[in-house]
Amino acid sequence: MAKRIQFRAHGGPEVLEYVDYQPAEPGPQQVRVSNKAIGLNFIDTYYRSGLYAPPALPSGVGAEGAGIVEAVGSEVTRFKVGDRVAYGSGPLGAYSDVHVLPEANLVHLPDAISFETAAGVMLKGLTVQYLLRQTYELKGGETILFHAAAGGVGLLACQWAKALGVKLIGTVSSKAKADLAKAHGAWETIDYSHENVAQRVLELTDGKKVPVVYDGVGKDTWPASLDSVAPRGLLVSFGNASGAVEGVNLGILAAKGSLYVTRPTLATYANNAENLQRMADELFGMITSGKLKVDISQRYSLADAAKAQTELSARRTTGSTVLLP
């Protein structure tokens, strides 16, 4: 028997259970992975709370991890037993000793990158890759606004933007987080606990605003995001850390300057094995070249997943958090 985290009903972290389970044999196009490290992400809390609907209850949790292939299905061609692999997408159930998932969801993990680093960077790093390199392809020289700059995604974005020659303005909730974001490459920071975000963006851009805002916070930052985008600019809403944006009046986009809004997902960009591996290879290259440093700032045992999610939701974490089986 193996161990996993599951929930039988939606609710707070207290609904998470640490239970015994029997991992399935891989189907023809599936791979069974012995997890060595598991990533913790806000999206995990969305499924637990009921904001997103899992396929069924009881449900596993998590979609990011890294480990070693221990079994492959009869039609699997890209992986063999013993391969080092990483993944950053479903099915749910990564919070486990052993996880079975489609071959197409896995990437080869270079020896130079540890399991903890991979588990702490796959979903967040691939998110930054598509945000900065595809959703709005930054060329260098732009000034952008990125909310929650001291979080796991934010710290990677700070570094990647700097490597591209982009000035990233990051929003934070404290001086300590401002210092952390700047240490990772943020050009300027705005402390939203006592500063007016949109007003500071105007000041920092000489009244021009920014061509793109990246907003993974959601409800709390939506108004400031709209007020920070330059006319005909793009607001990239990629997360709901503070709650979902609801009741949007499309007329506001006209009033604010013919704005564009997109709600991208990793699944759309990494829509096949080739695109996923290409994106991962660029991410891994940024890490091995030293341009991207992955901060594993918190480590919890798998059994303490509820505590880890509590800290994440309370915004008491920085960088990446991993669970260790």
Residue ranges of predicted features:
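Glycine-rich beta-strand-centered segment in the early N-terminal region that forms part
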Residues: 22-39, 49-93
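NAD(P)H dinucleotide-binding glycine-rich loop of Rossmann-like/cofactor-binding domains
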Residues: 87-150, 160
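Hydrophobic/small residue at the entry helix of a nucleotide-binding pocket
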Residues: 153
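Adenosine-nucleotide cofactor-binding segment
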Residues: 163-221, 272-274
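Glycine-rich phosphate-binding loop and adjacent beta-alpha segment
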Residues: 164, 172, 220-291, 325
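C-terminal hydrophobic helical "lid"/dimerization subdomain
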Residues: 273-325
